[in-house]
From Swiss-Prot:
Regulates transcriptional attenuation of the pyrimidine nucleotide (pyr) operon by binding in a uridine-dependent manner to specific sites on pyr mRNA. This disrupts an antiterminator hairpin in the RNA and favors formation of a downstream transcription terminator, leading to a reduced expression of downstream genes. Homodimer and homohexamer; in equilibrium. A motif (PRPP-binding) lies at residues 99-111. GO terms for molecular function: RNA binding; uracil phosphoribosyltransferase activity. It catalyses: UMP + diphosphate = 5-phospho-alpha-D-ribose 1-diphosphate + uracil. It comes from the Bacteria. SUPFAM superfamilies: PRTase-like. This is Bifunctional protein PyrR. Keywords: Glycosyltransferase, RNA-binding, Transcription, Transcription regulation, Transcription termination, Transferase. CDD domains: PRTases_typeI. GO terms for biological process: DNA-templated transcription termination. The gene is pyrR. Signal peptide: none annotated. Coiled coil: none annotated.
Length: 179
């Protein structure tokens, strides 16, 4: 039997994303030259939700993109040789813009490092900021998020699961013990 604890329900996730949207607007003094980019897979859906909230608050269209970091990961040798690049979908021009990278969970920092490499290969943003739904600690690289939905100190033997309605039927963040 797996011992699983719910950390955030649908309402808590909604509130966290609304707060992050307000923080992004405040920190950047609006949304001019702002691009929101989600890291595949769940980061994409979180980015889309953030854009919806920001557009509702500011009444301005905000470009949103998708970043596939498959071939930028430093653990690629552990992946199947059949790994297929799904492709990034970025706005035409990221050079000179403020890019908000969005991911579901920040853990070691390796996913974000790969995302930074992938993003910079597509242009030279003026600034890159990081927004995550959950920061669980245990960094292996000097990476710190600018916007956090929930700080969740964990043991390395725990797994944080983020489920989003777009891919998992329901919105929930839970933690479970690694077997």
């Amino acid at each position: 039997m797996i011992n699983k604890s719910v950390i955030m329900d649908e309402a808590a996730i909604r509130r966290a994303l609304t707060r992050i949207a307000h923080e992004i607007i405040e920190r950047n003094k609006g949304v001019e030259d702002l691009i929101i980019v989600g890291i595949k897979t769940r980061g994409i859906y979180l980015a889309q939700r953030l854009v919806e909230r920001i557009e509702m608050i500011e009444n301005v269209k905000v470009p949103v993109g998708e970043l596939d970091i498959t071939f930028y990961r430093d653990d690629l040798q552990h992946k199947s040789e059949d790994a297929i690049l799904q492709g990034s979908k970025l706005p035409d021009q990221i050079t000179g813009k403020t890019v908000i990278l969005v991911d579901d969970v920040l853990y070691t920092g390796r996913t974000v490092r790969a995302a930074l490499d992938a993003l910079i290969d597509n242009g030279r943003p003026r600034m890159i900021q990081l927004a995550v739904l959950v920061d669980r600690g245990h960094r292996e690289l000097p990476i710190r998020p600018d916007f956090v939905g929930k700080n969740l100190p964990t043991a390395r033997t725990e797994i944080v699961d983020v489920q989003l309605a777009e891919v998992d039927v329901m919105d929930i963040v839970s933690i479970r013990q690694l077997l």
